[in-house]
């Protein structure tokens, strides 16, 4: 092991991301729907942010949380997909050790932040349906700002130790990672030392952060559904159930692939085919950013009408 391949005595200069193992011959074709999904995510989330930002009537808490969700979706997909496409189309898998850690930090912290936003959105719907008279008092702009700050602080605080846990490990020249982007356990498994601390801390973060978030979200929607079924108007019930159904669907799409990835990395590493694991890991950074503007935005009457109005004004000006 030569000094030219190592820095800080034990840290590699670069890693090499291989893409989806076992499907190398299909990389070019797999990248096409990935690219299409990324473009849809960019356009959809950017349009949602633009519509909410331009219309003062949409500066209510629910829409501000939607705007935050779209911002995190843009950040999550843009952190991973461009490099993913470069690997699948151009075989440009090399990434510096520092760049890999930076991508890992961004992916996990943004994901944790998005989990916090989904929890905040569940709380928003709970207050709106179960305590509507106090809605504007409980969720004013100052409270929303504090919720956003706490979510950001929590995500950075729980993910930052990953960097130090990975930098302490020796890698013994192991540089090839069978993945399309850098994540904590993918890097840790390249080490030639005991990674029990990494496994335990990663599992603790997953359970205490996103696991706790998902439980609180489930409790919130339990109260919401109980309140909805006691509404006197069938139209009000249908509207509330339609909104909640969209929210629950995107929450399931967000959490299920993530928990599958976390758990297989730690307990089913040899039982689950590698290409299945990596393919699902790609989907959980692609599917939510694509679906969020559709399920949360396009199905919301106020946003849909303002978007159509904005498009009409654009055509008129042309």
Curated annotation (Swiss-Prot):
Record topology, Cytoplasmic segments: 50-57, 124-142, 221-240, 299-318
Source domain of life: Eukaryota
Disulfide bonds listed in the record: 100-192
Glycan-linked positions: 5
Compartments in which it is found: Cell membrane
Residues in compartment: Extracellular: 1-28, 79-102, 164-199, 262-277
A GO cellular component annotation in the UniProt record: membrane
Name of a matching Pfam family: 7tm_4
Membrane topology summary: Multi-pass membrane protein
Transmembrane segments: 29-49, 58-78, 103-123, 143-163, 200-220, 241-261, 278-298
GO MF terms, alphabetically ordered: G protein-coupled receptor activity; olfactory receptor activity
Gene3D superfamilies from the UniProt entry: Rhodopsin 7-helix transmembrane proteins
Alphabetically ordered keywords of this record: Cell membrane, Disulfide bond, G-protein coupled receptor, Glycoprotein, Membrane, Olfaction, Receptor, Sensory transduction, Transducer, Transmembrane, Transmembrane helix
GO BP term (any one): sensory perception of smell
Known role: Odorant receptor.
Family: Belongs to the G-protein coupled receptor 1 family.
Protein name: Olfactory receptor 52D1
Phylogenetic placement of the source organism: Eukaryota, Metazoa, Chordata, Craniata, Vertebrata
């Amino acid at each position: 092991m030569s000094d030219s391949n190592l820095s800080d005595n034990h840290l590699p200069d670069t890693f090499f991301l291989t893409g989806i193992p076992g499907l190398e011959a299909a990389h070019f074709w797999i990248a096409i729907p990935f690219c299409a999904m990324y473009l849809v995510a960019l356009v959809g989330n950017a349009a949602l942010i633009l519509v909410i930002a331009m219309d003062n009537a949409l500066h209510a808490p629910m829409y501000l949380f939607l705007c935050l969700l779209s911002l995190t979706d843009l950040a999550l997909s843009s952190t991973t997909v461009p490099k993913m496409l470069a690997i699948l189309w151009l075989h440009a898998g090399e990434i510096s050790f520092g760049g890999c850690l930076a991508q890992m930090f961004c992916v996990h912290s943004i994901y944790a932040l998005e989990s916090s936003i989904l929890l905040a959105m569940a709380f928003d719907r709970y207050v709106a349906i179960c305590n509507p008279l106090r809605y504007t008092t409980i969720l004013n702009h100052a409270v929303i700002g504090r919720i956003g700050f706490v979510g950001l602080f929590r995500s950075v605080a729980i993910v930052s130790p990953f960097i130090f846990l990975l930098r302490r490990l020796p890698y013994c020249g192991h540089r090839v990672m069978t993945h399309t982007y850098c994540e904590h356990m993918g890097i840790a498994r390249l080490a030639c030392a005991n990674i029990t601390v990494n496994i335990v801390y990663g599992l603790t973060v997953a359970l205490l952060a996103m696991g706790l978030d998902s439980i609180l979200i489930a409790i919130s929607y339990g109260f919401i559904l109980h309140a909805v079924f006691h509404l006197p108007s069938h139209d009000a019930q249908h509207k509330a159930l339609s909104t909640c159904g969209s929210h629950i669907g995107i929450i399931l799409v967000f959490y299920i692939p993530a928990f599958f990835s976390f758990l297989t990395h730690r307990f089913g590493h040899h039982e689950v085919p590698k290409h299945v694991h990596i393919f699902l890991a790609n989907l959980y950074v692609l599917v939510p950013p694509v679906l969020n503007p559709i399920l949360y935005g396009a199905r919301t009457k106020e946003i849909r009408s303002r978007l159509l109005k904005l498009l009409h004004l654009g055509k008129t000006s042309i």
